Curated annotation (Swiss-Prot):
Part of the ABC transporter DppBCDF involved in dipeptide transport. Responsible for the translocation of the substrate across the membrane. GO terms for biological process: protein transport. It is a multi-pass membrane protein. It comes from Haemophilus influenzae (strain ATCC 51907 / DSM 11121 / KW20 / Rd). This is Dipeptide transport system permease protein DppB. It holds the Pfam family BPD_transp_1. One of its GO terms (molecular function) is dipeptide transmembrane transporter activity.
Length: 333
């Protein structure tokens, strides 16, 4: 087991290095001058421009900028935002609860719905129910996030009276010590704040969780069909066990093992999908922060946010690999 864990951890190192190189290169190849965007055209002389470039370290060769950046990252310094002059880590962890809250509920409903729909589609194989679920999951997987979000805002939100953007309506003023709006609105005791926070979360969570729902549904259906054809399932039927008990207790438990392996990919999907989702719904999280940084050519924010998110995804995938190694010892050899 130790050898298996060591190999998995060792594989993370080249991945991390590749991410830093690719991120640094892509960020610096974005068209536009960050100094011009920061200062505007008014009062930006050649002397001021050169001074700002030197102050930000942008006048150095790219390889020197890269090694300087990596040296700071190793020390836990991700730099400061060009726009706000605040440390990137401080801004990231200030905004992260909003994204984490949205991603958690998107993952929760997509897991719950995907497992239920996938199981039903497998049990009702070759029926209209199975075909409908399969077609719906394919549609959900192919649907553009921005289009789906706009449809919900234009047609579903007015019908159900759901907020079209933001985490809480402006009529509510509460303290946010944790950054998690559901927790803070509950603790505040302000009448109607918690209900409004829940309503504000519904549409963004639906949009963000649609693609993961489709993935989990198809994965669960495929795994369940394979498990339901195993000999021990036929033995359980021969013993007279109820079909419901066979499906839930014996089949589903084993069918969920492959589903665990895609959780890491789903986390990556949620974090990447949050960029568009948060922009559509004016959700003040990491995704919207990244979009604003792209428009402002804020290199430290772009490099730091991508690196931190990539690290989170790597850690999640590593954890999933290790857990899968515990559940299924065969992959350790």
């Amino acid at each position: 087991m130790f050898k298996f864990v060591f190999k998995r951890i060792l594989m993370v190192i080249p991945t991390f290095i590749a991410i830093t190189l690719i991120t640094f290169a892509l960020v610096h190849f974005i068209p536009g001058d960050p100094v011009e965007i920061m200062m505007g055209e008014r009062g930006l002389t050649a002397e001021v421009h050169q001074q700002m470039m030197h102050q930000l370290g942008l006048d150095l060769p790219l390889y020197q900028q890269y090694f300087h950046y990596i040296g700071n990252v190793i020390q836990g310094d991700f730099g400061a935002s060009f726009r706000t002059q605040q440390p990137v880590l401080t801004e990231f962890f200030t905004l992260f609860p909003a994204t984490a809250e949205l991603a958690f509920f998107a993952l929760f409903w997509s897991l719950l719905g995907g497992i239920i729909l996938g199981t039903i589609a497998a049990v009702k194989k070759d029926s209209w129910i199975s075909h409908t679920v399969t077609a719906a999951s394919l549609t959900g997987y192919s649907m553009p996030i921005f289009w789906w979000g706009l449809i919900l805002i234009l047609y579903v939100s007015p019908q159900l009276g759901l907020p079209q953007g933001g985490r809480l309506d402006n009529e509510f003023w509460i303290d946010t010590p944790t950054g998690f709006m559901l927790i803070d609105s509950w603790l505040s005791g302000v009448s109607g704040a918690f209900e409004n926070a829940v309503k504000s979360l519904i549409l963004p969570a639906i949009v963000l969780g649609t693609v993961p729902l489709a993935i989990i549904t198809r994965m669960t259906r495929s795994a369940m069909l394979e498990v339901l054809g195993e000999d021990y399932i036929r033995t359980a039927k021969a013993k007279g066990l109820s079909y419901t008990r066979i499906v839930i207790v014996h089949a589903l438990r084993n069918a969920l093992i492959p589903v665990v392996t895609v959780v890491g990919l789903i986390v990556a999907q949620l974090l990447s999908g949050a960029v568009l989702t948060e922009t559509i719904f004016s959700w003040p999280g990491i995704g919207k922060w990244i979009i604003d940084a792209i428009q402002a050519r804020d290199y430290p924010v772009l490099q730091g946010s991508v690196l931190i998110i990539a690290t989170i995804i790597i850690v999640v995938n590593l954890t999933v690999d290790l857990l899968y190694g515990v559940v299924n010892p065969r992959i350790r050899h």
